Amino acid sequence: MASRDSANADITPEVLLRAYACGIFPMAESIDDPTLFWVEPELRGIIPLGGFRVASRLARTVRSDVFTVTVNRDFRGVIDGCASPQPGRDDTWINRRIRELYIGLHGIGHCHSVEVWQDDDLVGGLYGVSLGRAFFGESMFHRARDASKVALVHLVARLLAGGYELLDTQFVTEHLRSFGAIEVPRQRYRALLDDALHGVADFGALPVDQPVSGAQALEIIAKN
């Protein structure tokens, strides 16, 4: 279900948080479309944190630490990377207004990024919204093989360490399905969200000022 909003100028980061608490999120038709619309899918994508799967080959890549993974070091770089064309995706829903809103959420501590680096180059990452014990994954990108997958593994480890209960992916793709993503009906999602909003999680339970090793991330996931 989607609905057009006729007063986009009135959407603030605080309004956005209230929308997430109600189970809806904004999108734009394209990067050039100045307007936003609200979305509440009939079937919602989630990754059950206790059922997150890491393929053997990816686990080897994560454990090798061929990439350096950081948190909240370059939020703008990540959202700009997500807004750039990707293989198989020529267009994006991240317009200027979306970018401004989520940078605003980041500024008040409710939106976080995971960056993946190869030497000094940002080669992948993701960003999402944190509210209560729920994390809403917004978008990811990669410029090197497996970079976005490595970001997701590190995100899940951080969510598990921080006491999160819900990882919302909005929709399910085959890529996400390989990690254990499923679709749940709207009413079931609302119940999961309501439960996750009661309580507080800690995105900083793992260090945010220094990289976490791949081995440490995989160990946290394996214990859950």
Curated annotation (Swiss-Prot):
UniProt GO cellular component terms: cytoplasm
Reaction catalysis annotation: N-terminal L-lysyl-[protein] + L-leucyl-tRNA(Leu) = N-terminal L-leucyl-L-lysyl-[protein] + tRNA(Leu) + H(+); N-terminal L-arginyl-[protein] + L-leucyl-tRNA(Leu) = N-terminal L-leucyl-L-arginyl-[protein] + tRNA(Leu) + H(+); L-phenylalanyl-tRNA(Phe) + an N-terminal L-alpha-aminoacyl-[protein] = an N-terminal L-phenylalanyl-L-alpha-aminoacyl-[protein] + tRNA(Phe)
GO terms under biological process: protein catabolic process
A Pfam family it matches: Leu_Phe_trans
Compartment(s) where it occurs, according to its Swiss-Prot or TrEMBL record: Cytoplasm
Segments forming a coiled coil: none
Keyword Cell cycle: no
InterPro entries documented for this protein: Acyl_CoA_acyltransferase, Leu/Phe-tRNA_Trfase, Leu/Phe-tRNA_Trfase_C, Leu/Phe-tRNA_Trfase_N
EC number per UniProt: 2.3.2.6
UniProtKB keywords: Acyltransferase, Cytoplasm, Transferase
Source domain of life: Bacteria
GO terms, molecular function: leucyl-tRNA--protein transferase activity
Record family assignment: Belongs to the L/F-transferase family.
Record function comment: Functions in the N-end rule pathway of protein degradation where it conjugates Leu, Phe and, less efficiently, Met from aminoacyl-tRNAs to the N-termini of proteins containing an N-terminal arginine or lysine.
NCBIfam families, sorted: aat
PANTHER family in the record: LEUCYL/PHENYLALANYL-TRNA--PROTEIN TRANSFERASE, LEUCYL_PHENYLALANYL-TRNA--PROTEIN TRANSFERASE
Protein name: Leucyl/phenylalanyl-tRNA--protein transferase
Organism: Rhodopseudomonas palustris (strain BisB5)
Name of the gene: aat
